[in-house]
Amino acid sequence: MFKIVNRYGKSVTVVMRMEEKTLFTSEVLANIVCKFLNTKKTKPDWLVNNFDVVACKPYMVEKV
């Protein structure tokens, strides 16, 4: 299992298939989401967390 964390160690929660997800079974999917968040300038609609996307960069994938 993998999770995405911001620079402060907080987990990122996203909405996928109408479900909120914090843990990913695939490292590839977690890396894709992480790369997207690192290049994004504004908060995407599918991001559940209420923190500043730009100020919390870089996002990293951690193994749980």
Language-model segments: which ranges?
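Short, flexible N-terminal segments of the mature chain
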Residues: 11-36
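Short aromatic-glycine-(Arg/Gly/Cys) micro-motifs in beta-strand/loop hairpins
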Residues: 1-20, 48-53, 61
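Short, mixed-charge low-complexity intrinsically disordered segments
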Residues: 31-64
